[in-house]
Design a protein with these regions (language model features):
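PLP-dependent amino-acid enzyme catalytic core
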Residues: 1-149
């Protein structure tokens, strides 16, 4: 952290966003990707093996897990880089309470940045008029102001 770090903003960010988004945590002996959403897909895998490949794995001692980024905040993998960029900006003092973040986006990254509104920051997304209405809705639901280009 630097002298200019907004510690109150960093604390809110870590509690409300960072703790819920997969990110690399480095300890003295380990490196762990925290909060990665895994779903047990064993039953589906066995059914697929039986149906598609005619393999009977019912008695096989195995577990199959899938990484399901659709279960992340915002439902998109784009929340990962957004959270890392936000974390770096807060830690280095580049992003502080009361500031506005402006992003040109076609959707998911802007939606992920919209999480900043939960921290009391303003987010403006510069978007194409041709963007799908569903994306506009998600941006607005996240309290992100949109400006059509």
């Amino acid at each position: 952290m630097t002298e200019g770090t907004d510690n109150a903003l960093l604390e809110r960010f870590e509690q409300d966003i960072w703790s819920k988004v997969p990110h690399l945590e480095e300890g003295s002996e380990t490196r762990v990707v925290n909060a990665t959403p895994l779903v047990d897909m064993t039953a589906d895998f066995k059914e697929c093996a039986k149906t598609v490949f005619k393999l009977d794995l019912d008695n096989a001692d195995l577990k199959v897990f899938g990484k399901m980024d659709s279960t992340l905040l915002t439902g998109s993998i784009k929340v990962r880089p957004a959270a890392n960029i936000i974390n770096d900006a807060i830690v280095t003092g580049k992003l502080r309470s009361g500031q506005t973040v402006i992003e040109a986006t076609s959707g998911n990254f802007g939606i992920a940045l919209g999480l900043l509104s939960k921290l009391g920051l303003n987010v403006i997304a510069l978007v194409s008029r041709k963007l799908q209405e569903g994306v506009f809705e998600e941006l607005r639901n996240g309290n992100t102001r949109t400006i059509d280009l």
